[in-house]
A protein has these predicted regions:
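Aspartate-rich (DDxxD/NDxxD/DxxxD) Mg2+/diphosphate-binding motifs
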Residues: 1-20
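Histidine-centered, transition-metal-coordinating active-site segments
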Residues: 17, 21, 26-34, 38-230
Length: 230
């Protein structure tokens, strides 16, 4: 359930929840029946630092900046992908209208999906080359526009009334499933990593669900079955 699911798990788990940290946990502690994958530092660093929420996208002084150019490319690609797809999804869903998008952003980034992506990607290439490829960069003009577009999405899409309604539904589904699993961990929770409390391993189980699986399990566990008509 996207950000809503992440927020809900963050409230349920004693140490909170962030999808990037959970991704690292999966490859280090959960894969291969708890043995983990033998990944290099560079790959693990890129996984853990690929996401930045509302923080700096490519601040060279930021403590959470990926250590490698490849990791920095993943980080900026993540932003380019989700701001473009989310703005289009919000338009198609009727959450916002084209005229709601600030004219200044349209002027800098373009009106159409392909135009925006092309402009952002080419700017990253040109700014990074201009800096001698010491780090992945964006020009100040495009960076300001991307940050403004991201903030527009937070204010008008992610935190709008429809999103809050979906959050309440998500909290209900995930919260009920989490409580159900905690009552019978032997049925759902894996026995590894050894030493991790059941509540953390229950979080692993919930976090590993797809939306469809979670809704199907919720229906099977909590909703009554229809009676056949004789």
């Amino acid at each position: 359930f996207g950000h809503a699911g992440e927020q809900t798990l963050g409230k349920l788990l004693p140490l909170g929840f962030h999808h990037a940290d959970q991704s690292l946990r999966v490859v280090e502690k959960l894969e291969y029946d708890g043995k983990g994958l033998n990944l290099t530092f560079e790959v693990r660093d890129g996984i853990q630092r690929h996401s930045k929420g509302r923080g700096d996208i490519l601040d060279e002084d930021a403590e959470d900046m990926p250590a490698t150019l490849e990791g920095q490319i993943v980080r900026v690609s993540d932003v380019i992908a989700y701001v473009n797809h989310d703005i289009d999804d919000a338009l198609r869903a009727g959450i916002i209208r084209e005229e709601d998008v600030p004219a200044g952003l349209v002027k800098v980034l373009g009106k159409w999906h392909a135009t925006r992506i092309d402009r952002m990607v080419m700017d990253v290439v040109e700014a990074s080359l201009a800096g001698g490829l010491e780090r992945i960069a964006m020009s100040d003009r495009i960076m300001r526009a991307v940050v403004e577009l991201r903030e527009f999405l937070y204010q008008n899409v992610y935190f709008n009334s429809a999103a809050r309604d979906e959050l309440r539904k998500t909290e209900k589904i995930i919260g009920d499933l989490f409580a159900y699993v905690m009552e019978r961990p032997e049925e759902y929770v894996k026995p590894y990593p050894a030493g991790d409390p059941a509540v953390v391993r229950a979080g692993d189980f919930i976090a590993g669900m797809t939306d469809r699986y979670a809704m199907a399990l919720y229906e099977r566990v909590f909703l009554p079955k229809s009676w056949p008509i004789l």
